[in-house]
């Protein structure tokens, strides 16, 4: 448990006030102290290291600060996603909420890896965030291979046609299904739901969160800060054995406006 979770739990128990009163009342002195301590402790959660997740990392394979166009110059956008760089962050959205979009990291990563990035919601009204990983063509082609069909952000192009991958929806607050109660891991092609866990990023949260994705052989885990929301072992019953090396992409639905920074991927040691 990181300090944020410990303090947040302890403060609310100690003060014995409803959470909504603590966070919204301008006349409640404990509320001001609570918000300050939670904000400080929350920033400490973002400083978590790989060892905090009971996994041994080997080499840092890739990193991008995501704070400038130069830092993501080789990334590939599919669909009408727009990027803006400010205050050390990369904001991503679709102007006028036109269409969904997918942003591919240029590197191909090994089967076993740990990825981390930070993100913060800029539009609390609606949105949905997905990470694709271990992504290749059906015959293990690179996802950017010119022989594969063109893609423009339409969901079926990523989960039902010419690609195989895993994907996790870890923030889900769409107009048709607001504040969805679960995070989902699917194995593609086929949109096969293989695991459902507790909700990911809280739909009311406007603070920065660290996302940690770990694929260790057949074992897949995803954390929001220090909170485990996906924990599944691929037994090969869906679409054959565990997927191998492939690319990672960040997907947003058309209503979504998040900002991102500090994307990193490590390989894992052989003794995990």
Language model features by range: what are they?
Residues 49-77:
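Extracellular carbohydrate-recognition regions
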Residues 186-210:
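Short, aromatic/His-centered strand-loop micro-motif at the edge of beta-sheets
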Residues 82-99:
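Short carbohydrate-recognition loop motifs
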Residues 66, 115-117, 207-216, 220-222:
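Short tryptophan-centered beta-strand motifs in secreted/extracellular beta-sheet-rich domains
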Residues 22-35:
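Bacterial N-terminal signal peptides that target proteins for export
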Residues 233-261:
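Flexible glycan-contacting loops in extracellular carbohydrate-active proteins
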Residues 34-43:
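Bacterial N-terminal signal peptides
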Residues 96-183:
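Secretory/extracellular carbohydrate-interaction modules
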């Amino acid at each position: 448990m990181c300090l944020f979770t410990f303090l947040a739990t302890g403060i609310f128990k100690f003060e014995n006030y409803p959470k909504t009163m603590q966070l919204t009342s301008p006349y409640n002195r404990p509320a001001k102290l609570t918000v300050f301590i939670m904000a400080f402790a929350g920033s400490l959660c973002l400083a978590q290291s790989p060892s905090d997740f009971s996994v041994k990392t080997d080499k840092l394979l890739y990193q991008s600060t995501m704070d400038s166009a130069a830092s993501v110059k080789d990334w590939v956008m599919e669909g009408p996603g727009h990027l803006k760089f400010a205050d050390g962050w990369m904001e991503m959205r679709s102007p006028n909420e036109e269409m969904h979009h997918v942003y591919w990291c240029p590197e191909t990563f090994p089967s076993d890896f740990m990825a981390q990035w930070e993100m913060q919601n800029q539009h609390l009204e609606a949105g949905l965030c997905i990470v694709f990983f271990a992504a290749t063509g059906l015959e293990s082609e690179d996802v950017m291979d010119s022989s594969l069909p063109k893609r423009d952000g339409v969901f079926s192009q990523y989960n039902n046609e010419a690609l195989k991958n895993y994907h996790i929806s870890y923030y889900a607050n769409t107009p048709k299904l607001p504040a969805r109660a679960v995070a989902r891991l699917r194995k593609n092609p086929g949109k096969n739901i293989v695991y459902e866990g507790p909700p990911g990023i809280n739909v009311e949260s406007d603070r920065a969160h660290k996302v940690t994705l770990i694929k260790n052989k057949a074992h897949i885990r995803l954390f929001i800060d220090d909170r485990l929301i996906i924990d599944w072992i691929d037994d090969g019953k869906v679409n054959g054995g565990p997927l191998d090396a492939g690319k990672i992409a960040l997907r947003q639905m058309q209503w979504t406006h998040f900002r991102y920074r500090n994307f990193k991927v490590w390989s894992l040691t052989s003794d995990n």
